[in-house]
Protein backbone atom coordinates (compact mmCIF):
# COMPACT_ATOMS: atom_id res chain seq x y z
CA UNK A 1 0.00 0.00 0.00
CA UNK A 2 1.36 3.45 -0.84
CA UNK A 3 2.69 5.28 2.18
CA UNK A 4 1.60 8.73 1.01
CA UNK A 5 -2.15 8.12 1.32
CA UNK A 6 -4.11 7.97 4.55
CA UNK A 7 -4.59 4.48 5.94
CA UNK A 8 -8.35 5.05 5.92
CA UNK A 9 -8.25 5.36 2.11
CA UNK A 10 -7.36 1.66 1.83
CA UNK A 11 -9.05 -1.55 2.91
CA UNK A 12 -6.78 -3.02 5.58
CA UNK A 13 -7.55 -6.61 4.55
CA UNK A 14 -7.20 -6.30 0.75
CA UNK A 15 -5.04 -3.22 0.16
CA UNK A 16 -7.50 -1.82 -2.39
CA UNK A 17 -8.15 1.90 -2.45
CA UNK A 18 -11.69 2.38 -1.06
CA UNK A 19 -12.16 6.15 -0.88
CA UNK A 20 -11.00 9.40 -2.46
CA UNK A 21 -10.50 7.70 -5.82
CA UNK A 22 -9.50 10.96 -7.50
CA UNK A 23 -6.14 11.67 -5.85
CA UNK A 24 -2.41 11.62 -6.54
CA UNK A 25 -1.17 8.21 -7.68
CA UNK A 26 1.95 6.20 -6.87
CA UNK A 27 4.57 5.49 -9.53
CA UNK A 28 3.89 1.75 -9.61
CA UNK A 29 1.06 -0.76 -9.30
CA UNK A 30 1.46 -4.30 -7.93
CA UNK A 31 1.03 -6.79 -10.76
CA UNK A 32 1.29 -4.28 -13.59
CA UNK A 33 3.60 -2.05 -15.58
CA UNK A 34 3.08 1.69 -15.72
CA UNK A 35 3.01 3.20 -19.20
CA UNK A 36 3.17 6.76 -20.47
CA UNK A 37 1.28 8.23 -23.41
CA UNK A 38 4.09 7.58 -25.90
CA UNK A 39 4.11 3.89 -24.93
CA UNK A 40 0.32 3.65 -25.14
CA UNK A 41 0.32 5.27 -28.59
CA UNK A 42 2.71 2.56 -29.83
CA UNK A 43 0.56 -0.23 -28.38
CA UNK A 44 -2.58 1.35 -29.82
CA UNK A 45 -1.03 1.45 -33.30
CA UNK A 46 0.13 -2.18 -33.05
CA UNK A 47 -3.38 -3.27 -32.12
CA UNK A 48 -2.35 -6.32 -30.11
CA UNK A 49 -3.35 -5.08 -26.64
CA UNK A 50 -6.85 -5.11 -25.16
CA UNK A 51 -7.79 -1.66 -23.82
CA UNK A 52 -10.00 -1.70 -20.72
CA UNK A 53 -11.67 1.49 -19.51
CA UNK A 54 -12.68 1.23 -15.85
CA UNK A 55 -14.18 4.71 -15.49
CA UNK A 56 -16.89 4.44 -12.83
CA UNK A 57 -20.50 4.91 -13.78
CA UNK A 58 -22.16 8.25 -13.19
CA UNK A 59 -25.79 7.78 -12.37
CA UNK A 60 -27.69 4.99 -10.69
CA UNK A 61 -25.33 2.09 -11.47
CA UNK A 62 -26.61 -0.98 -13.27
CA UNK A 63 -30.26 -2.01 -13.26
CA UNK A 64 -30.45 -5.18 -11.12
CA UNK A 65 -33.20 -6.57 -13.34
CA UNK A 66 -31.78 -5.87 -16.81
CA UNK A 67 -28.07 -5.31 -16.18
CA UNK A 68 -28.11 -2.13 -18.28
CA UNK A 69 -26.17 0.81 -16.91
CA UNK A 70 -28.25 3.83 -15.91
CA UNK A 71 -25.88 6.64 -16.80
CA UNK A 72 -26.28 10.33 -16.12
CA UNK A 73 -23.37 11.30 -18.38
CA UNK A 74 -21.99 9.85 -21.59
CA UNK A 75 -18.39 8.67 -21.79
CA UNK A 76 -15.77 8.99 -24.50
CA UNK A 77 -12.78 6.70 -24.38
CA UNK A 78 -9.88 5.36 -26.42
CA UNK A 79 -11.25 3.77 -29.62
CA UNK A 80 -11.75 0.02 -29.41
CA UNK A 81 -11.79 -0.03 -25.61
CA UNK A 82 -14.06 -2.21 -23.52
CA UNK A 83 -15.77 -0.12 -20.82
CA UNK A 84 -16.29 -2.00 -17.56
CA UNK A 85 -17.67 0.58 -15.10
CA UNK A 86 -17.19 0.30 -11.35
CA UNK A 87 -14.79 -2.68 -11.44
CA UNK A 88 -12.03 -0.48 -10.06
CA UNK A 89 -13.85 0.25 -6.83
CA UNK A 90 -12.17 -1.05 -3.70
CA UNK A 91 -15.07 -3.30 -2.77
CA UNK A 92 -17.20 -5.15 -5.33
CA UNK A 93 -20.42 -7.02 -4.75
CA UNK A 94 -20.70 -10.59 -6.05
CA UNK A 95 -22.37 -9.47 -9.29
CA UNK A 96 -19.62 -6.98 -10.16
CA UNK A 97 -16.91 -9.47 -9.18
CA UNK A 98 -18.42 -12.00 -11.61
CA UNK A 99 -18.87 -9.22 -14.24
CA UNK A 100 -15.16 -8.39 -14.01
CA UNK A 101 -14.03 -12.03 -14.14
CA UNK A 102 -16.33 -12.99 -17.03
CA UNK A 103 -15.45 -9.95 -19.11
CA UNK A 104 -11.70 -10.37 -18.63
CA UNK A 105 -12.05 -13.99 -19.73
CA UNK A 106 -14.09 -12.88 -22.76
CA UNK A 107 -11.85 -10.03 -23.93
CA UNK A 108 -8.67 -12.06 -23.38
CA UNK A 109 -10.14 -15.09 -25.18
CA UNK A 110 -9.38 -17.05 -22.01
CA UNK A 111 -5.65 -16.34 -22.34
CA UNK A 112 -4.35 -15.04 -19.02
CA UNK A 113 -1.12 -13.95 -20.71
CA UNK A 114 -3.00 -11.70 -23.17
CA UNK A 115 -1.78 -8.11 -22.90
CA UNK A 116 -4.38 -5.79 -21.36
CA UNK A 117 -4.11 -2.07 -20.66
CA UNK A 118 -6.27 -0.55 -17.90
CA UNK A 119 -7.10 3.12 -17.62
CA UNK A 120 -9.66 5.60 -16.33
CA UNK A 121 -8.85 9.32 -16.19
CA UNK A 122 -5.90 11.17 -14.69
CA UNK A 123 -5.37 10.85 -10.94
CA UNK A 124 -7.93 8.03 -10.68
CA UNK A 125 -7.30 4.96 -8.53
CA UNK A 126 -9.85 2.80 -10.37
CA UNK A 127 -7.32 1.41 -12.87
CA UNK A 128 -4.80 0.81 -10.07
CA UNK A 129 -7.36 -1.31 -8.21
CA UNK A 130 -8.43 -3.12 -11.40
CA UNK A 131 -4.83 -4.06 -12.25
CA UNK A 132 -4.32 -5.51 -8.78
CA UNK A 133 -7.60 -7.41 -9.07
CA UNK A 134 -6.73 -8.80 -12.53
CA UNK A 135 -3.28 -9.82 -11.31
CA UNK A 136 -4.82 -11.74 -8.41
CA UNK A 137 -6.99 -13.56 -10.97
CA UNK A 138 -3.80 -14.76 -12.66
CA UNK A 139 -3.50 -12.31 -15.56
CA UNK A 140 0.17 -11.65 -16.22
CA UNK A 141 0.65 -9.00 -18.92
CA UNK A 142 -1.06 -5.99 -17.40
CA UNK A 143 -0.40 -2.37 -18.28
CA UNK A 144 -1.46 0.67 -16.28
CA UNK A 145 -2.06 4.00 -17.99
CA UNK A 146 -2.63 6.41 -15.08
CA UNK A 147 -3.07 9.47 -17.32
CA UNK A 148 -6.14 7.80 -18.85
CA UNK A 149 -8.39 9.53 -21.34
CA UNK A 150 -7.23 12.93 -20.07
CA UNK A 151 -3.62 12.25 -21.00
CA UNK A 152 -4.63 10.52 -24.22
CA UNK A 153 -6.75 13.45 -25.43
CA UNK A 154 -4.15 16.01 -24.27
CA UNK A 155 -1.81 14.57 -26.91
CA UNK A 156 -4.49 14.98 -29.62
CA UNK A 157 -5.26 11.29 -29.79
CA UNK A 158 -8.80 10.25 -30.73
CA UNK A 159 -11.53 9.49 -28.24
CA UNK A 160 -14.97 8.22 -29.20
CA UNK A 161 -18.38 7.73 -27.58
CA UNK A 162 -18.59 4.48 -25.66
CA UNK A 163 -21.21 2.28 -24.08
CA UNK A 164 -20.49 0.08 -21.07
CA UNK A 165 -20.76 -3.69 -21.25
CA UNK A 166 -24.12 -4.79 -19.84
CA UNK A 167 -24.03 -6.75 -16.59
CA UNK A 168 -25.27 -10.33 -16.93
CA UNK A 169 -27.95 -10.86 -14.33
CA UNK A 170 -28.15 -14.41 -13.04
CA UNK A 171 -31.68 -15.55 -12.31
CA UNK A 172 -32.39 -16.35 -8.70
CA UNK A 173 -33.82 -19.77 -8.01
CA UNK A 174 -36.65 -20.16 -5.57
CA UNK A 175 -37.10 -23.57 -3.98
CA UNK A 176 -40.66 -24.78 -4.00
Residue ranges and their predicted role:
Residues 1-34, 43-46, 62-117, 122-176:
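Rhodanese-like catalytic fold shared by cysteine-dependent sulfurtransferases
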Residues 40, 48-55:
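Short hydrophobic beta-strand that contains or immediately precedes a catalytic carboxylate
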Residues 56-57, 125:
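Short, solvent-exposed loop/turn segments at secondary-structure junctions
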